[in-house]
Structures are given as C-alpha cells and as structure tokens.
C-alpha cells in the first residue's frame, strides 16, 4: 500500500483555504434528514400545504393496506400495456382461469354494506382514486373506521387529508340518509391549489357514501362551519349520478385502479366513446378504438354491442373493460348492462350471456 506524501499540517493548511460553509439547520433537523435519506426506496409523501396540521376534520381519510397491494400486484401487472388494455393476452392455463374468476376491481351491489368508499390522491400525480375499504365487522361505523385507519400510518404513495379524531364527532342517520359532522376546530388558510385538491377528495368520497346529504355543526352545535377558503359550510347535497366515464390508472408501483373522468358527459354514448381514447393525463383507455359498435338503452337497462373485430376476451384487460363500462353505466343511472358480440360468454366471474347488474363502487381493498 502506497504511503501518502501529504502530512497532517499540509492537509490542515489546504482545508483552511476552503470557503466557509454554514449550516443553519438544528441538530434535530439534520438527524431527521439523514434518517429520511436512508429510505431511498420509499417515495416521500407530499402533503397538501402548510395548513394541513390543522386540516379539515370532516374528510374521512382511510389508509390503504400494503398487504393487499402485495397480493394484488401479480394480477395488476398483467394489465400493464403500452396502448389500450384490451390488447393484453389471455391466460389459458387452469391456474390462470381460476385466478380470473377471483379477480375484480369493483364491489358488487350485494356487498355494499361491507365497504366504505373514500378518495385518495396519488402523491406523484395528484390523481383522484376512489378506493372501497372493507369493514372489519358488519356493525362498524364511519367513526369506528376513522379510529382504526388512523393507527396504521400513511402510505407513501397516497395523499389523504389528516383527520384529528378528537376534533370531530360524526353521527350517522341511516333512516334520514344523513351524515352529521360536528367540527370542534374549524380549518382555515388553505391555498387555492390545496382547496382544489381538497374539494375533489371530499366530493369523490361523499359520492360513494350511503347518505344523500351531510350537515355541518360547530362546537357549540350551531349550524355551519367555516372550511378553508370555501366560506361557511352548512349542508351539502351528494349527487349520485355524475355522468362520467372510467379509465385505467396505474401508479408507479404497478397497481391498477379504475378512475372516473374529470368532466361529465351529456350522454352515456359520449362517455363510452371517450373511453376509447382518454384525453385525461396519466390514464389509459379501457376500450380499443372501434371496439363498441352500438350503445342503446331501454329504461334503466343499457345494451352494449361490440364489433366483430373487437378483442373482448377472458383476461385481466377484459375484466377491467367490462367493469369500467359497468361503472360508467352506473354514473348515468342504469341498473344493469347487457353485452353482445363478445368472443366468449365468460369474462372473469361474469356470465356475459346474461344481463349484469352495475356494481356498488370501484377498487375494493382490505385493511389488515
């Protein structure tokens, strides 16, 4: 090993000639940043502005279970693609067929009472994603779920609004289809950007609730609470038919979600046409161009006829397409959909030869 020609005094002299560097951070801050730097494999959570420490307590923020996503990732990677998801190859093995029978990206209507649907935003793109979280027991209330989910921490990939359990009291009135929220500490001082994201999260969450209106009460039990730059909230009606289409959204972890469009459409035919070529950023169309030949309706029954050239088969891509169309039909008030001219009579768990009821909500997950 070669010996250095520099002695200690020469090294000190050279170091003394370097420009002075001052670090105004506290020792605690430096330690915190060094600790965070070790977690390079975890993307940082992007919070929604400085006011989030006292953020709105009326938004019911639930946490997605990482265990669920570990289970779901293999089937979700099958849906990855460069263009339309309907180009994904069908798995023909018995094991794959059995897996397809269990694969679904929606909550069936008969299981609606077992889930609570809320919205989260992707930390990288701010895309709004509705997720349906399974209750841990049949009698669990929104308030119970609030306590349970708050103990799990925040996932790196998701943005939620911090909810302070001790600052909010939630009462459910199922018979009146009303949700009452008493806010003990009003939230203020949101930026315009934060207000927009908050509004989207709140609106999407309330849409999937079993309630038709939400009433806001102050700590003194008076009607109305001031929230951000919105002004005073007294009561919010919850529209159930937003007339939107659905697309495939895939985050950086390769997880797939069915997400609604940012804008609404005049007719269901227009909405389905838009699903062939999504103009929405960070989404992929669920339908191959020209795959749908006609869309007709009879009362609350929708009929979708595919073209003979369409690639509609029993695959992950086929399931995503069928369920995306079912959710789109639900947005326009339809209760069931009949599909014709498919390559197969079975796609996933669905018997395509029969009318299919629209689902209750998108993207079911489990908390563990």
From Swiss-Prot:
One GO cellular component, as annotated: plasma membrane
Query: Which residues pair up as cystines?
Result: none
Keyword Repressor part of the UniProt annotation: yes
Instruction: For this UniProt record, give its keywords in alphabetical order, as a comma-separated list.
Output: Cell membrane, Membrane, Repressor, Transcription, Transcription regulation
Q: How does it sit in the membrane?
A: Peripheral membrane protein
Instruction: List the biased-composition ranges (Polar residues).
Output: 73-87
Is-annotated flag, keyword Protein biosynthesis?
no
Q: Where is this region: Disordered?
A: 73-101
Location within or outside the cell = Cell membrane
Q: What happens when the gene is disrupted?
A: Insertion mutations in this gene partially restore antibiotic resistance to the beta-lactam antibiotic cefuroxime (CEF) in a sigM deletion mutant.
Q: What does this protein do?
A: The anti-sigma factor for extracytoplasmic function (ECF) sigma factor SigX, inhibits SigX activity and stabilizes it.
What is the name of this protein?
Answer: Anti-sigma-X factor RsiX
Source species: Bacillus subtilis (strain 168)
């Amino acid at each position: 090993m070669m010996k250095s020609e520099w002695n200690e005094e020469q090294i000190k002299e050279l170091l003394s000639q370097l420009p002075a560097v001052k670090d105004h951070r506290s020792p605690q801050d430096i330690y915190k940043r060094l600790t965070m730097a070790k977690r390079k494999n975890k993307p940082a959570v992007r919070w929604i502005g400085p006011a989030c420490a006292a953020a709105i307590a009326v938004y019911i923020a639930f946490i997605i279970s990482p265990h669920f996503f570990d289970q779901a990732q293999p089937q979700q990677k099958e849906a990855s693609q460069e263009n339309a998801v309907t180009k994904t190859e069908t798995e023909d093995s018995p094991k794959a067929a059995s897996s397809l029978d269990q694969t679904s990206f929606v909550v069936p209507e008969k299981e609606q009472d077992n889930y609570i649907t809320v919205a989260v935003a992707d930390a990288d793109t701010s895309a709004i994603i509705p997720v349906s979280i399974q209750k841990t027991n049949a009698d669990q209330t929104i308030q119970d779920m609030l306590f349970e989910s708050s103990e799990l921490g925040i996932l790196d990939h998701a943005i939620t609004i911090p909810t302070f359990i001790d600052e909010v009291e939630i009462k459910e009135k199922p018979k009146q289809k009303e949700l009452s929220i008493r806010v003990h500490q009003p939230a203020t001082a949101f930026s315009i950007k934060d207000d927009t994201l908050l509004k989207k999260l709140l609106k999407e969450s309330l849409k999937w609730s079993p309630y038709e209106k939400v009433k806001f009460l102050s700590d003194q039990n008076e009607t109305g609470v001031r929230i951000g730059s919105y002004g005073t909230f007294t009561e919010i009606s919850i529209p159930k038919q937003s007339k939107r289409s659905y697309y495939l959204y895939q985050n950086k972890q390769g997880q797939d979600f069915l997400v609604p469009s940012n804008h609404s459409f005049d007719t269901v035919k227009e909405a389905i046409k838009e699903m062939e070529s999504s103009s929405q950023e960070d989404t992929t169309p669920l339908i191959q161009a020209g795959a749908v030949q006609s869309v007709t309706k009879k009362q609350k029954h929708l009929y979708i006829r595919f073209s003979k050239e369409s690639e509609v088969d029993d695959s992950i891509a086929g399931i995503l397409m069928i369920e995306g169309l079912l959710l789109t039909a639900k947005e326009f008030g339809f209760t069931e959909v009949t599909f014709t001219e498919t390559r197969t009579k079975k796609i996933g768990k669905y018997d395509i030869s029969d009318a299919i009821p629209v689902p209750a909500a998108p993207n079911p997950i489990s908390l563990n």
